């Protein structure tokens, strides 16, 4: 996970703004480039960039009121999820707002055929030279010394004052952050003779050393239950960073661990040029982990692997980086694709095992994408995210130029409209796994649905870690599942994988099972889960009171760079909600009794 430690840059550019720029207003400004990123040259003026412009809603509370109305048990609209057309009507800006923005673009040199009005978003393509004139900025090529990735970016951009109140953000401009699979980097071939192991050895008792579907079924009370094949209970799995789910590996996995599911498969949703190449040399561990446990735990459900392009090959000529590598923003591509699907094609559950430190992303970007998760929630999608694998933090310092010691919340796990999944390990007792991320958002205030649970934890915590986190921020994770040493087939071999990236798909499959249970009784799918979990559903989870997370060791676990050290930094598992396992792990039978 890249950490932003800022270094000063482009001060002379800021000081040399022409007076004609005074009619413009700055939308976003970074003091300097992120840690590990350095400027390597000016951007090619002819390079074409595809931009996303998010229109600021005149009444942002309307979306939030709607998602809580359809997601909070007891309210009159509970379960009455919106159709896509109803959501479009809710979000559509005034005609004059869109026309004003489009007029600015065309008058500034953007060709009309390069503009696409999508209601609350406007997409436009133009070259760097035109973009610089439009946004009163200068684009440069920045290189990340850790990954060798290069991107065309800027540190500040502006729009005319006359439309500034309508522009929430334009990207890619100031977005340097890079998604990472939420695994704890424990990837090792399993030496156990799997063929010689009996079915009993794959049971809950063996979760101590190896997690399989049989282990999870017994531990979480699923038994032999499978979902029914129906169009209104689909599961989506997010794929990024050229991770491709392999059909052959899934078949090997099912043959060994879920023989009754052999022959079941998944479909593909390829977004913005995304692929799902079979048999290639690239990494497939994360994708295989996700698909094998989602299909294995709910094999009759319709499962789709949504593969979104967003990072191409390395660029040999850094002054002219490859467009596909540097300027395609995969979260926005995926989310905009999903919210435009007809309701009968939407997944009821979406599992994603990727994230980044919250502070490494522009504030406008986290707000805009979090709102897109809320939009999915209004249409009945349970959005599941892994909480991360850095405990309270990895670098444990701010990126505002002050380098202050601070815990690092993870996004999108910190968005209040997703359900964040922490990690556990072992049985009898099941306990928090040390890498499970959690904490409190520095961007999003604590939602009301969390108040009672989180205030109770903060009272127990007292002054410990005071000043290192925001006690009024959205707290995460919400719940947890096993996260250590999952048996996964990858490239034909068994591998052990650890991380909350494993916890998320396991939980997604269990939520799909709960949806199946409700649909069989004539009730709608659960949709956005958190208001139910925090009001009543928590009693269907097993409270985890042993173990805790750890972090802030003095070195960033991804870059290896020296960082802040906080002795004994940890969130402990406690009675009730805590920021390492949330309310705990699922008990399927108990959950069926507290469903709305």
UniProtKB/Swiss-Prot annotation:
Gene Ontology molecular functions: metal ion binding; serine-type endopeptidase activity; tripeptidyl-peptidase activity
Record text on cofactor binding: Binds 1 Ca(2+) ion per subunit.
Active site feature: 286, 290, 501
Maturation propeptide residues: 18-203
Glycosylation (residues): 265, 403, 572
Superkingdom of origin: Eukaryota
Reactions listed under catalytic activity: Release of an N-terminal tripeptide from a polypeptide
Domain Peptidase S53: 210-596
Cofactors required: Ca(2+)
Alphabetical keyword list: Calcium, Glycoprotein, Hydrolase, Metal-binding, Protease, Secreted, Serine protease, Signal, Virulence, Zymogen
Principal location class: secreted
Residues the entry annotates as binding Ca(2+): 543-544, 576, 578
Signal peptide annotation: 1-16
Pfam families referenced in this protein's UniProt entry, alphabetically: Peptidase_S8, Pro-kuma_activ
EC identifiers of the protein: 3.4.14.10
Cellular compartments per GO CC: extracellular region
Compartments (UniProt record): Secreted, Extracellular space
SMART domains hit by this protein: Pro-kuma_activ
Classification via PANTHER family: PROTEASE S8 TRIPEPTIDYL PEPTIDASE I CLN2 (PTHR14218), TRIPEPTIDYL PEPTIDASE SED3 (AFU_ORTHOLOGUE AFUA_3G08930) (PTHR14218:SF32)
Main function: Secreted tripeptidyl-peptidase which degrades proteins at acidic pHs and is involved in virulence.
Name of the molecule in the record: Tripeptidyl-peptidase SED2
Species, as recorded: Arthroderma otae (strain ATCC MYA-4605 / CBS 113480)
Upper taxonomic lineage: Eukaryota, Fungi, Dikarya, Ascomycota, Pezizomycotina
Chain's gene name: SED2
């Amino acid at each position: 996970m890249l950490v932003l430690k800022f270094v000063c840059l482009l001060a002379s550019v800021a000081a040399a703004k022409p007076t004609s720029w005074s009619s413009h207003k700055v939308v976003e400004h970074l003091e300097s480039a992120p840690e590990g990123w350095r400027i390597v040259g000016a951007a090619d003026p002819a390079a074409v960039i595809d931009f996303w412009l998010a229109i600021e809603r005149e009444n942002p509370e309307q979306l939030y009121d709607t998602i809580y109305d359809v997601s909070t048990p007891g309210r009159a609209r509970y379960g009455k999820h919106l159709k896509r057309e109803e959501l479009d009507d809710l979000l559509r800006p005034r005609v004059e707002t869109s026309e004003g923005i489009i007029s600015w673009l065309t008058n500034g040199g953007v060709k009309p055929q390069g503009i696409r009005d999508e209601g609350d978003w406007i997409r436009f393509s133009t070259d760097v030279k035109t973009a610089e004139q439009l946004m009163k900025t200068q684009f440069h090529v920045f290189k990340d010394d850790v990954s060798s990735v290069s991107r065309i970016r800027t540190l500040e951009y502006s729009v005319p004052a006359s439309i500034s109140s309508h522009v929430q953000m334009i990207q890619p401009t100031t977005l340097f952050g890079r998604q990472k699979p939420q695994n704890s980097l424990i990837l090792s071939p399993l030496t156990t003779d799997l063929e010689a192991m009996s079915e009993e050895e794959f049971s809950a008792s063996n979760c101590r050393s190896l997690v399989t579907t049989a282990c999870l079924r017994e531990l979480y009370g699923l038994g032999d239950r499978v979902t029914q094949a129906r169009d209104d209970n689909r599961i989506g799995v997010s794929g990024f960073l050229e991770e491709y789910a392999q059909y052959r590996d899934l078949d090997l996995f099912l043959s060994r661990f879920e023989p009754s599911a052999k022959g079941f498969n998944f479909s593909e949703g390829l977004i913005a040029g995304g692929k799902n190449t079979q048999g290639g040399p690239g990494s497939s561990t994360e994708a295989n982990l996700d698909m094998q446990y989602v299909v294995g735990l709910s094999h009759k459900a319709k499962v789709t692997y949504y593969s979104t392009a967003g990072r191409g090959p390395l660029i040999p000529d850094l002054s002219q980086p490859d467009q596909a590598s540097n300027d395609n923003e995969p979260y926005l591509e995926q989310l905009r694709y999903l919210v435009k699907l007809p309701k009968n094609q939407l997944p009821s559950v979406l599992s994603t095992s990727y994230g980044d430190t919250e502070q490494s992303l522009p504030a406008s970007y986290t707000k805009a994408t979090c709102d897109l998760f809320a939009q999915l929630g209004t249409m009945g999608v349970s959005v599941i995210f892994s909480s991360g694998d850095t405990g309270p933090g990895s670098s444990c310092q701010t990126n505002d130029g002050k380098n202050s010691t601070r815990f690092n919340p993870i996004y999108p796990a910190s968005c209040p409209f997703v359900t964040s999944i922490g990690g556990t390990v072992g049985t009898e007792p099941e306990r928090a796994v040390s890498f499970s991320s959690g904490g409190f958002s520095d961007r999003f205030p604590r939602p009301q649905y969390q108040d009672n649970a989180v205030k109770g934890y903060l009272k127990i915590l007292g002054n410990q870690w005071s000043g290192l986190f925001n006690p009024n921020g959205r707290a995460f994770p919400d719940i947890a599942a096993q996260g250590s040493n999952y048996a996964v087939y990858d490239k034909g071999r068994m591998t052990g994988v650890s991380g909350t990236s494993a916890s998320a798909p396991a939980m997604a499959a269990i939520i799909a099972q709960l949806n199946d249970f409700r649909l069989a009784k004539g009730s709608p799918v659960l949709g956005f889960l958190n208001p139910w979990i925090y009001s009543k559903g928590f009693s269907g989870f097993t409270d985890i009171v042993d173990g805790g997370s750890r972090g802030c060791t003095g070195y960033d676990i991804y870059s290896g760079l020296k960082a802040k050290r906080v002795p004994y930094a940890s969130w402990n598992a406690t009675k009730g909600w805590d920021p390492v396992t949330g309310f705990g792990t699922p008990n399927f039978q108990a959950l069926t009794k507290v469903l709305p």
